[in-house]
Amino acid sequence: MSSSKETKAPPTRTSEDWAMLPWRKLERHVYRLQKRIYRASERGNVQAVHRLQQLLMRSRAAQLLAVRRVTQDNRGKKTAGIDGVKSLAPPARLALVDALHPTHVKRSKARPVRRVWIPKPGKPEKRPLGIPVLRDRAHQALVKQAVEPEWEARFERHSYGFRPGRGCHDAIEAIFGVIKQKPKYVLDADIAQCFDHISHHALLNKLATYPALRQTIRAWLKAGVMDAGVFTPIEEGTPQGGVISPLLANIALHGMEAAIRDAYTVREGKPTLIRYADDFVILHPTHAGIEKAKEAIEPWLQTIGLELKPSKTRIAHTLYPLQGETGFDFLGMTIRQYPVGRTHSGRDTYGRLLGFKTLIKPSEDAIKRHVRAVGQVVRKHQTAPQAALIEHLNPVIRGWAAYYRTVVAKDSYARCDDWLYSKLRYWARRRHRNKSLRWVSRKYWAFDEGAGWLFRASDGSVLTKQTKH
């Protein structure tokens, strides 16, 4: 009697396999490794940093989280690279995790990014994005988990853009802390096409990582761009759209703060540089001090292939007008000080009157962009039911109002509400051209004793008012 061994088919991966993974446990495991990398970097133990980074990237937990980041969590997860893949079903996500195993990664080659042009808010020109293929995005997310903690231990105090636990409001708060007791001169600067012109050589030298990782990052930088089917090689820059691009830009710009401060003597007074990605301001008590900052920053930027954008670089003062303007705009805020009498004046740490007050408000450009965005939603839903219009307007209004909730925005909110009311009244009247304004108002608005007139649909949905925030 002959016996034969049964050949078992490999288990079929299902959506449940992905959903049932212990995500909290995986996150804790990766976080512990990242904390060890951070501490080793703080100690300056380069060998330990590189060893732990390799350990993290071999970790199945880190590989799973990297794939989840680019297929499930990330806002750009539905944007395809040149592979045309926009999304993956859970079983395919597990296959992508397998592709991040070191043996597979070594054999893979970085593929060109797909050029996508998106409009700049409030401007006619467009901004280029470079979208990597999904496999490269997942690999970049894995590498970012390993490299970011090393640099978080090293990044300068006043770098706020694209960093965990930091954001726009922290940068604004830092500026307020510098100027609240004493007015300052300001170099309000912008780097020309920062992401497109960073020197690869300077970036890789600053990165100073181990050879295999250096080669991986170099391959992404040199992968090239496919724009409408035409391939273009890349010799500089890190395309916006890659998972790791903001981190690489921050690494390239690291050292700017120290370079500026080192140019000053103690007697001159050290300036303060506050940076959010490629936007930054430098503050100093004297005009000569700001001129010196501009002279110091330009050659430093040249060492990494960058330069200031003249049309967006100016010297301002927070209290007094310079060239007809007082204060400056930063991250959608207007930051300015106003001379006031003793009743409204702030006080210094000793209780003495300052003679001015500092106000931070939404900038005029930010208000115009918001009004334009809201207007586009209304126009797009001219024939839609009221409830559908409310559903699409509310996230735009809430997001904008939430961003400015910590600054002096009451008047700006009221202006936007008034403008939106007139827009909605026109929207409603054109749907019922033969009806009176009173009839239209009763159909689309309802009066609430606490909130006043509300744009309310028959299903009970209500348009959010910005003045409520």
Predicted segment positions?
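Non-catalytic terminal/accessory segments
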Residues: 1-469
